[in-house]
Design a protein with these regions (language model features):
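Helix-loop-helix hairpins and the membrane-proximal interhelical loops
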Residues: 60, 64-88
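Residue-level signature of the transmembrane alpha-helical core
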Residues: 84-88, 109, 113, 124, ...
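Membrane-helix interface "capping/anchor" motifs
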Residues: 71-79, 115-126, 163-167
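Generic transmembrane alpha-helix motif of multi-pass integral membrane proteins
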Residues: 66-68, 107-123, 154-158
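Short juxtamembrane and helix-loop transition motifs at transmembrane-helix boundaries
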Residues: 12-13, 39-48, 66-70, 89-90, ...
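Structural signal for the C-terminal ends of transmembrane alpha-helices
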Residues: 65-74, 157-162, 241-249
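Interfacial aromatic-anchored transmembrane helix boundaries in multi-pass membrane proteins
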Residues: 91-106, 127-168, 198
Length: 295
């Protein structure tokens, strides 16, 4: 019988600490969202100078920082470099598409990309940070930081549970994510803004209002039309991007290896990062010594 490992408690403590930080970060973002929905602060669109905007900015930023701190020890340098790129991608595409007659947003491609490569916590942090940074140019997006974080979290969970291993499942996961995100964002759009800020999405809300719907009902219907299709497109674009990466580049991300996020990441490939086996253990079954050496 082998004796219990004396190093196990010290190995478990960092994992427990990371989990606690993730929970605290999620709670900070959720609490800020509840505050906005319950208080319905109309002055939040005036910029970061208002009290409600400062509360929202502090709550969302605290949640995003806690999430980043939680996952930072597990993130490779390649992910840290990608996060600022993802923020810029979200803001540029979101600002451009929001000014057109396209009834979509396309402001979550960077968020979903980070979520697929680095996991739910990193995706949620990227989504929240995107809204925070974007709010300095467009204050109306700040209250939607909770929805952006939720999209990143759900995208990371979809990747973890294999919905990106089959290309056709990616838009299905995006469609489902869009339904949830639309329901979450509708109260903010209704009670804080009295509508949506996009040109095309605002026209859809106006059409439902003209048919006699209440403001919340009209915005919810618009969200259930636009958000699922938008997220299906976003998830599909991200799937194309990650599969276009060379296999060696994809396997640089620990989350991708650990959870076999993409097709072709077999257990043998994942084992390439595992600690070397002890004496008496040969290559994995079904592989030749030559292929094992190449791995």
């Amino acid at each position: 019988m082998s004796s219990p490992s004396l190093t196990l408690p010290s190995q478990e403590r960092p994992a427990a600490r990371r989990r606690l930080l993730e929970i605290l970060g999620a709670l900070a973002i959720a609490a800020t969202y509840v505050y906005l929905v319950l208080n319905q602060p109309a002055d939040i669109t005036g910029g970061p100078g208002s009290a409600s905007a400062l509360i929202a900015l502090t709550g969302f930023l605290a949640g995003a920082v806690l999430l980043i701190v939680a996952v930072l020890p597990t993130l490779p340098a390649s992910t840290l470099v990608l996060i600022p790129v993802a923020l810029v991608l979200n803001i540029v595409l979101g600002q451009f598409v929001g000014s057109t007659l396209v009834p979509f947003y396309l402001d979550a491609i960077g968020t979903v990309l980070i979520a697929v490569l680095a996991g739910p916590a990193a995706g949620a942090a990227t989504g929240a940070l995107s809204s925070i940074v974007w709010s300095f140019f467009n204050p109306t997006v700040l209250p939607f930081a909770a929805g952006a974080a939720l999209i990143g979290c759900l995208a990371g969970l979809a990747a973890r549970y294999g919905l990106f291993r089959r290309f056709y499942l990616a838009p299905v996961a995006g469609f489902a994510t869009g339904i949830i995100a639309g329901v979450v964002s509708a109260p903010v759009a209704a009670f804080v803004f009295g509508g949506t800020s996009g040109v095309a999405t605002g026209a859809i809300v106006s059409a439902f209002r003209a048919m006699g719907d209440t403001l919340l009902a009209a915005i919810t219907k618009q969200a259930l039309i636009s958000d699922p299709m938008d997220k299906a497109i976003v998830f599909t674009v991200v799937a194309i991007l990650v599969y276009a990466l060379p296999r060696r580049a994809r396997l640089q991300f620990p989350f991708v290896r650990r959870h076999r996020v993409l097709a072709g990441n077999t257990p043998v490939e994942a084992a390439a990062d595992a600690p070397a086996q002890g004496p008496g253990h040969g290559p994995a079954q079904g592989t030749s010594p030559d292929s094992a050496r190449k791995g």
